[in-house]
Amino acid sequence: MSSIEEQITKSDSDFIISEDQSYLSKEKKADGSATINTADEQSSTDELQKSMSTGVLVNGDLYPSPTEEELATLPRVCGTIPWKAFIIIIVELCERFAYYGLTVPFQNYMQFGPKDATPGALNLGESGADGLSNFFTFWCYVTPVGAALIADQFLGRYNTIVCSAVIYFIGILILTCTAIPSVIDAGKSMGGFVVSLIIIGLGTGGIKSNVSPLMAEQLPKIPPYVKTKKNGSKVIVDPVVTTSRAYMIFYWSINVGSLSVLATTSLESTKGFVYAYLLPLCVFVIPLIILAVSKRFYKHTPPSGSIFVRVGQVFFLAAQNKFNLEKTKPSCTTTVGRVTLKDQWDDLFIDELKRALRACKTFLFYPIYWVCYGQMTNNLISQAGQMQTGNVSNDLFQAFDSIALIIFIPICDNIIYPLLRKYNIPFKPILRITLGFMFATASMIYAAVLQAKIYQRGPCYANFTDTCVSNDISVWIQIPAYVLIAFSEIFASITGLEFAFTKAPPSMKSIITALFLFTNAFGAILSICISSTAVNPKLTWMYTGIAVTAFIAGIMFWVCFHHYDAMEDEQNQLEFKRNDALTKKDVEKEVHDSYSMADESQYNLEKATAEEEIMKST
């Protein structure tokens, strides 16, 4: 580690970074004005920039920046994930507990009547239930876009999450009321059920588009640096790896929460739907309490207000220059009419916007992927109902997707990915997403083969009726389809979320994340379009068609975007350029905020020592 001795001063904030990299806050007079500790403010700022250019300041210690050779040869490791991020992850876990606990029983609730062999409520049939299920999925992934706009421009992420959580709770309460047996028997559940779907969709959309960006915002915003381990070996602490691990943990928590299906499906079959929906309602109280008491602990990106106006101005100016975004940079075009561009945005903002647009292009193929993923929530549940389930509910088997993810996410994060990084084997986002498409294809191929086997068995063969609902084939051989989908999520879904966040400008992270989630809505539309084929005996061909389409989409995705992997490191550096472009006040605030209030006594001691050194030097 290098040693430094710096003074940083400004009229409204002064800090001293001493040889051990601790800092001192500004002195204030009785009238509240600041005391200036040096006469040469500009010199101090220059010295700060010089020291930061040769190293990275982390918790008061200065670590060297990696050289080109070190970037190419040293293994990359994860940095520290702050506890604040884990609190937000707990909120997401509870929200997903509620969401999956509610939605997995939906298929039976919608498809069957209360007197059927598999009890339900609305008696819509498989095709009708699939249509309403796909509408709900579509709605849940449309609402994040509106919520993201509200968060980025008006309320901020945290406030949007709080409002959405309250709306969500109201929706679950209405849903629970529709499942009361007397309401079902009276045939009055349909209206309340549809209303609850709309309200729950609003709530989950507001949380979905903002909770992962809020979590990722709590991670340290520092460039890569070289750290020497206790055994003398060197590693690069890479924020990209830190972000990747945070999203792995985030997605892992989603699937821990989704195990609520084990409880709600059991309650559905033994106690009834009202108890299955009452459990998520009670659990959802936990995130409401957490959100109510934890606001002061988080880092908050304030709403940007005019960010979308600026983006519109950029696109308007680009359209006047043959859609060349380079021509919208202030360094290329100084004014438009009476507007000075440097007062509206800088060159770096244009580079960030170009990076975000590249990310959005990759989202275009995701609807095909979500069609594969969506089979797990409707048609695969119905497929399980055509098999021998014993005393196990057919909608319970979706839990094997979550179980597989809970097992294999830590294996990938702690064994496979570090091993690849250790030997400098590139496994960058586009390659991971392509692999996700291939696993989704494999899952649909397996489902198609299994459906053909079901049709070959009696007593129903392909002629299922109200009195003949299942063939003589064990449901347990359906598990590999869920496991293959789980692998596809590790590579396609997690990477997509991470890609959306890391490639978005700071003031647009919610909206870019929402646009990624919005691809789910298009997947739901495609699923609605093919829902007419989700009937016997066409299901084998439906799964086959989905598999072929997903395979072609995966190949085209790789062909179109594989060159993005070569640009990955360069694109990630834009985030740190933005940090380097912070004003001195922002830099000082970062240092000040990093100093724990618990160390106040040590701080006062260092302050007195530094003041004594200053007096000696003057």
Curated annotation (Swiss-Prot):
Modified-residue entries (Phosphothreonine), positions: 35, 45, 54, 618
Domain of life (superkingdom): Eukaryota
Record PTM Phosphoserine, positions in chain: 22, 25, 33, 44, 51, 53, 594
A Gene Ontology molecular function term of the record: tripeptide transmembrane transporter activity
Record keywords: Membrane, Peptide transport, Phosphoprotein, Protein transport, Transmembrane, Transmembrane helix, Transport
Compartment(s) of residence: Membrane
InterPro entries given in the database record: MFS_trans_sf (IPR036259), POT_fam (IPR000109), PTR2_symporter_CS (IPR018456)
Disulfide bond positions: none
Principal cellular location given in the protein's record: membrane
Membrane topology recorded in Swiss-Prot or TrEMBL: Multi-pass membrane protein
Single Gene Ontology BP annotation: negative regulation of TORC1 signaling
GO cellular component, one term: cell division site
Spans annotated as Disordered: 26-50
PROSITE patterns listed in its UniProt record: PTR2_1 (PS01022), PTR2_2 (PS01023)
Residue positions where Phosphotyrosine is found in the record: 23
Pfam family, one: PTR2
Biased composition (Polar residues): 34-50
Transmembrane intervals: 131-151, 161-181, 187-207, 247-267, 273-293, 400-420, 430-450, 475-495, 510-530, 541-561
Gene3D superfamilies (UniProt xref): MFS general substrate transporter like domains (1.20.1250.20)
UniProt family annotation: Belongs to the major facilitator superfamily. Proton-dependent oligopeptide transporter (POT/PTR) (TC 2.A.17) family.
Function: Uptake of small peptides.
Protein name stated in the entry: Probable peptide transporter ptr2
Organism, as annotated: Schizosaccharomyces pombe (strain 972 / ATCC 24843) (Fission yeast)
